[in-house]
Amino acid sequence: MTTIKTSNLGFPRLGRKREWKKAIENYWAHKIDKAELDQTLTDLHKENLLLQKNYHLDSIPVGDFSLYDHILDTSLLFNIIPERFQGREVNDDLLFDIARGNKEHVASALIKWFNTNYHYIVPEWDNVEPKVEKNTLLERFKYAQSINVNAHPVIVGPITFVKLSKGGHQSFEEKVETLLPLYKEVLQSLVDAGAEYIQIDEPILVTDDSESYEDITRKAYDYFANEGLGKYLVIQTYFERVHLKFLSSLPVGGLGLDLVHDNGYNLKQIEDGDFDQSKALYAGIIDGRNVWAADIEAKKQLIETLQQHTQQLVIQPSSSLLHVPVSLDDETLDESIAEGLSFATEKLDELDALRRLFNDNDLSKYEHYKARYERFQSQSFKNLEYDFESVPTHRKSPFAKRKQLQNQRLNLPDLPTTTIGSFPQTREIRKFRADWKNNRITDAEYQEFLQNEIARWIKIQEDIGLDVLVHGEFERNDMVEFFGEKLQGFLVTKFGWVQSYGSRAVKPPVIYGDVKWTAPLTVKETVYAQSLTDKPVKGMLTGPVTILNWSFERVDVPRKVVQDQIALAIDEEVLALEEAGIKVIQVDEPALREGLPLRSEYHEQYLEDAVHSFKLATSSVHDETQIHTHMCYSQFGQIIHAIHDLDADVISIETSRSHGDLIQDFEDINYDLGIGLGVYDIHSPRIPTEEEITTAINRSLQQIDRSLFWVNPDCGLKTRKENEVKDALTVLVNAVKKKRQESESTTA
């Protein structure tokens, strides 16, 4: 058998304890200067590279590290600058402004990266002049060489980059052709600098419509081959299966395939002879998206199968390790569960164990991981019985009747205003929560602090003039982690952070066992907030689909079963809130769209299961109780009918960064439930103008019945500063008041 090699597609940027996030946010807050930021990030990049080197990888990725987002990096590399930001020097401050917006200009759109919880900044092609502006990829490659790291450069490929872009008058094919000479310039510079191969990521080739652009894909890679670059290129794909016969026909040196999330299709195509054995096979055999340890015996058998179909086998994670935490080393977890976990460094060590086994006949690491896996699997985490059939999955009455009863009960004005749920998580709030968790303050002291914050923000909302209030979620570190801490069957780590967008990090809980509600989760804070005001206060919950999608899910039972277990737990909390007198309850599902499978053949079942779980969680209440939900970051065209099927009394949707595109989705459906299309972007510190809010409202009312329309920001306000929140919400309420006055004068 031939020697196998090991490689990696990408590594977490955050650092073990979020050093990356803290440095960038300190720079934004003017607490450090650019020189200190650069030094901190250089040190972290070096640490990441050397850490990977410790696991004896034959090649280590460079170009995956970024100050914000690798797609935005590619935009700046090729001078694809949004028109409103043009005319400035291409540097890191420009990058941050495109991503976050500034006082003069809105940020670029923020979209989910395929079906993950990572987000990328959408490239904009309007009136651009593509050119290689600053070859930062070459700089990073040379840096890796300077510290004696055997690295391979990583760049997103032209097909994926253009497909994820928007704007411009050129066709898709014309944009690709425009970029090819620029890609050639960058790729040639890397080869000239000594790159043995270049990882060119084309995950778009796993999607449904990839066959419709096979011609331009072939044209692109034929071009690179004719320029003498083909043999240096390894096309990496991940998250799903590919059309392997086509991909193998491209004139490149190697192909990377996901052999974890492909539902077995990629392996079958290999076994059917569709892989060109003259190429290197980069086999994604270790799960890059979940945190469970590999069944190393099964991986050994898979490698033995793959060796029959290629002379050049490289084993790697199934995708970039961007989607998992850095290391288990700093965790203090129950060993019985920890033995079943594997973060980024552990996944690299699993690869090293397999490399040693096959190349050196060294069984030590292999036997270690095999024993750990067998001990973990010997435990039983399936020990609860569920009565799914006894819980209703439909509201008692149709929406029209519910709306009438809710209008009488709530007595809200025309164009009611609200927020999505969270208010700023200040340093003081985080400190109090940390002090409480570490027993540095008493329960009573912590509760007093929370009540003071809730009372302060109830008054702020009343003073601004909002119609439906929220308690602010000051007791919550994260909208999923909070529930993971309180529901049976979840494990919450201490340092299990992953990047969501920009400097935003989340700490997904790990679902290891059966899920159960054991006590009220949110009732105390919500009831206290309601006691302070005559206006309705929303109960704020996270929905079952989002909790599952934003957790590391267990793999020993079907996904639908876990999702419905969570739904029953949320149903218990919904009923507890209703019984406590809460009239409006929001069950957020921001991640419903992101979990949609990349292949359409799986869409119907996914959406059917998602709708069922949401209704399982929300249908037990009385007609008078108003159920809200919220979604964000998404392209909704594919799921608009499923959104309607949720039968939520009101849905709020992020739309501001789509620059109005989302409203087009409502032209094909007569949406007859309550809806709020977010009227300003909370991801940017920029304060909207009344004119912008009014324009957003007017545009929405062209498609949405006024009696159904709500006005709200597009997401929670957790990451904003207090003055930004107050100023923006004041603008929003003033704009709505003027719209109401216009209506009154028209009907007078």
From Swiss-Prot:
The keyword Lipid metabolism does not apply. GO terms for molecular function: 5-methyltetrahydropteroyltriglutamate-homocysteine S-methyltransferase activity; zinc ion binding. L-methionine binds at I420, G421, S422, E473, D588. It comes from the Bacteria. It catalyses: 5-methyltetrahydropteroyltri-L-glutamate + L-homocysteine = tetrahydropteroyltri-L-glutamate + L-methionine. InterPro entries: Cbl-indep_Met_Synth_N, Cobalamin-indep_Met_synthase, Met_Synth_C/arc, UROD/MetE-like_sf. Its cofactor is Zn(2+). Pathway: Amino-acid biosynthesis; L-methionine biosynthesis via de novo pathway; L-methionine from L-homocysteine (MetE route): step 1/1. 5-methyltetrahydropteroyltri-L-glutamate binds at R18, E19, W20, K21, K112, W550, E594. L-homocysteine binds at I420, G421, S422, E473, D588. The active site is at H683. The keyword Methyltransferase applies. Pfam families: Meth_synt_1 (PF08267), Meth_synt_2 (PF01717). Belongs to the vitamin-B12 independent methionine synthase family. Catalyzes the transfer of a methyl group from 5-methyltetrahydrofolate to homocysteine resulting in methionine formation. This is 5-methyltetrahydropteroyltriglutamate--homocysteine methyltransferase. The lineage of its organism: Bacteria, Bacillati, Bacillota, Bacilli, Bacillales. The gene is metE.
